Amino acid sequence: MASTIARTEERQNAGTMELKDDTVIIVLGASGDLAKKKTFPALFGLYRNKFLPKGIKIVGYARTNMDHEEYLRRVRSYIKTPTKEIEEQLDSFCQFCTYISGQYDKDDSFINLNKHLEEIEKGQKEQNRIYYMALPPSVFTTVSDQLKRNCYPKNGVARIIVEKPFGKDLQSSRDLQKALEPNWKEEEIFRIDHYLGKEMVKNILIMRFGNEFFNATWNRHHIDNVQITFKEPFGTEGRGGYFDEFGIIRDVMQNHLLQVLTLLAMERPISFSAEDIRDEKVRVLRAMDAIEPKNVIIGQYGKSLDGSKPAYKEDETVPQDSRCPTFCAMVAYIKNERWDGVPFIMKAGKALNEQKTEIRIQFRDVTSGIFKDIPRNELVIRVQPNESVYIKMNSKLPGLSMQTVVTELDLTYRRRFSDLKIPEAYESLILDALKGDHSNFVRDDELDASWRIFTPLLHYLDDNKEIIPMEYPYGSRGPAVLDDFTASFGYKFSDAAGYQWPLTSTPNRL
């Protein structure tokens, strides 16, 4: 009787229990770009640091027809091995990697996959399976049906990791959710937004609620405006066909930047449990109106000023009449007691002057009187590269006068934590999926609320053919009107600080 109750409770908690043994990770789309750049390097990183469950097995599945040796050769090519030790660890990692080829819409293919899984699961007490869908959204529904019908474990836990995009607007997102609902419980679905796995994004809650001096000033009475900025120094460069279908708003802002906004704006959760955190994020989204077109500017990059870099429309995969925005700046408002009237300025663009993702919180002006035009305080969180936090503050310039100077309290992670490795976002998120921790994954109602905010704007831009994005040069800061746009919502730029971020060579970790 007791064992029956225990098994029942375990089934009820299947979505949140940690998978320690008898686990197989199946990478669907194993020959694709995402698996190559992110999934396999992340799995190897977890293996190197001994975070994968004991006896883990990794199965690749894709349409590409290749034998076991060719598959292992590809896996090896995905992972950098700068030392002999890492090369030996990769050899060991490859010993539990296997591959099966098949179609995404054929029962026979998935029956064959299930036979392979059952073969490598022989002797296990349970069949715990994580299906990582590194696939284009066009096959999500078909593959979901096939997995449930032919590959769902008889005795064990099943989880499915789904990559963005989760639709193109509110209706398509709901259609996708309805397609997944018959096959998968919400607790079995892990919707990845890899920005939620980034170290500095995960640090937002600790900074906010673990430091009283931040918590006390985190409101409309002290904060004038918030900027969340995403900049890439490269264009589409041959991948314009995919990007043109979605654009910068769907690709970056509706998901990555909005997720950061919810963490910045949410109230203190009851606990750090996944549901309590996500409940508070949803409350923020429900307090936001749809983005108004008057609070938006869009741009599309042209040639660089020296002519060395091509314009967006010079990409052979991009239609010549494309109106797809490669840059956007917009302002959102949250209608609640804490944030009413505070503009949240989100900016994102390709082919800009630098690689940077940062959060810039600008506080209100110092009460006038003894100071004249003294610069505002700012809290800046650098998400990437060079993960850092610094506070711009006013201080007395050493000497006999009472002259003020802007200085900074600077926490640069690579200096302060030089002996610690900052994990890649995908490593962190795959580990969370193994643990059954949904905190850093997107819930269904959260997804629905986010699309409600963006869909009217997206339809407005899609339907009004006369709206043409402003051209900006490849390698610039964006459209020429950008500074006036941010200033119109209260942002005050001051060069009194003369602050220059330390430039160091860092890998692109997007």
Curated annotation (Swiss-Prot):
Look up keyword Oxidoreductase and say if it applies: yes
| Record: residues binding D-glucose 6-phosphate | 164, 194-198, 232, 251, 350, 384
Which SUPFAM superfamilies does the entry link to? Glyceraldehyde-3-phosphate dehydrogenase-like, C-terminal domain, NAD(P)-binding Rossmann-fold domains
The top EC class, named as a word, is: oxidoreductase
This entry's Enzyme Commission designation comes to: 1.1.1.49
Which GO terms of type biological process are on file? glucose metabolic process; pentose-phosphate shunt, oxidative branch
Q: Spell out the reaction equation it catalyses.
A: D-glucose 6-phosphate + NADP(+) = 6-phospho-D-glucono-1,5-lactone + NADPH + H(+)
- Which pathway does the UniProt entry assign to this protein? Carbohydrate degradation; pentose phosphate pathway; D-ribulose 5-phosphate from D-glucose 6-phosphate (oxidative stage): step 1/3
InterPro entries in alphabetical order: G6P_DH (IPR001282), G6P_DH_AS (IPR019796), G6P_DH_C (IPR022675), G6P_DH_NAD-bd (IPR022674), NAD(P)-bd_dom_sf (IPR036291)
**Record's keyword annotation contains DNA-binding:** no
- List positions binding NADP(+) 2: 347, 356, 360, 382, 390-392, 410-412, 477
Q: Where does NADP(+) 1 bind?
A: 29-36, 63, 164
State its role: Catalyzes the rate-limiting step of the oxidative pentose-phosphate pathway, which represents a route for the dissimilation of carbohydrates besides glycolysis. The main function of this enzyme is to provide reducing power (NADPH) and pentose phosphates for fatty acid and nucleic acid synthesis.
Please report the name of this protein according to its UniProt entry. Glucose-6-phosphate 1-dehydrogenase
Q: Which organism is it from?
A: Aspergillus niger
